Amino acid sequence: MKFGIVARRDKEAALKLAYRVYDFLKVSGYEVYVDTDTYKYLPEFHEEDVLPLEDFDVDFIIVIGGDGTILRVEHKTKKEIPLLGINMGTLGFLTEVEPHEAFFALSKLIEGDYHIDERIKLRTYLNGENVVPDALNEVAILTGIPGKIIHLRYYIDEGLADEIRADGLIVSTPTGSTGYAMSAGGPFVDPRLDVIVIAPLAPIALSSRPMIVPSYTKIDVRNLAVTREIILAIDGQFYTYLEPETEITIRLSPRKTKFVRFTNEVYPKYTMKIKRKF
């Protein structure tokens, strides 16, 4: 069994726990690799065990950090490697255990006492080409000039859904429904559902409301303000400016994100975290 370890780089406690996990797994006889960025911030790992995250070819990745760290890992890994998240962030919607549970969780993982939770992702096409990362949380189409609204028209399976003047449009998975989409007025969606949330961001018209559509839906977005650039943001990890005439299409990705889970609990785990968030 082979493991990869990635830690939140700006938190000393996360880096120290990463080394303890690394040492525990090495002493237990497993192959263990550490990503290059973690090594830069804590160069105590054996150099021969250091690899770029993109080159990880392991059975599991232990992610020690918050949701942002998990999203960074998910964007950089090329394979669908199951992730075990140890929470060193604020709320940790995507993580599975707290730091004091880390070694108990590792023991259960080694013993095979776990299950895999698969989450859908979204794929974005720009003028018909997929040149940007898949989204685990959301695809956000945002105004390129703060304080200036954008004029968007979006279609669902070729049919006109709405035309909005707003700060942007968020297209979210159930996983991302507790993030940016919820701040835009979207609902909490049970992560076991295969649906997509579409949420206008601060629209002028109060009739432009969030909606939920099936995951197999094709969503096309057009920028009607032909002189104004827009920003495409994916999971808060990837950003790019788009020319005004860019045709944006969002569909279900063939890839999924896999998480190691030790229980099937959804409630009250998520609802309590939402209460703490707001």
From Swiss-Prot:
It catalyses: NAD(+) + ATP = ADP + NADP(+) + H(+). Keywords: ATP-binding, Cytoplasm, Kinase, NAD, NADP, Nucleotide-binding, Transferase. Pfam families: NAD_kinase (PF01513), NAD_kinase_C (PF20143). It comes from the Archaea. Its cofactor is a divalent metal cation. The active site is at residue 67. NAD(+) binds at residues 67-68, 72, 137-138, 148, 165, 167, 178-183, 202, 237. GO terms for cellular component: cytoplasm. InterPro entries: ATP-NAD_kinase_N, ATP-NAD_kinase_PpnK-typ_C, NAD/diacylglycerol_kinase_sf, NADK. GO terms for biological process: NAD metabolic process; NADP biosynthetic process. Its EC number is 2.7.1.23. GO terms for molecular function: ATP binding; metal ion binding; NAD+ kinase activity. Belongs to the NAD kinase family. HAMAP family: NAD_kinase (MF_00361). This is NAD kinase. The lineage of its organism: Archaea, Methanobacteriati, Methanobacteriota, Thermococci, Thermococcales.
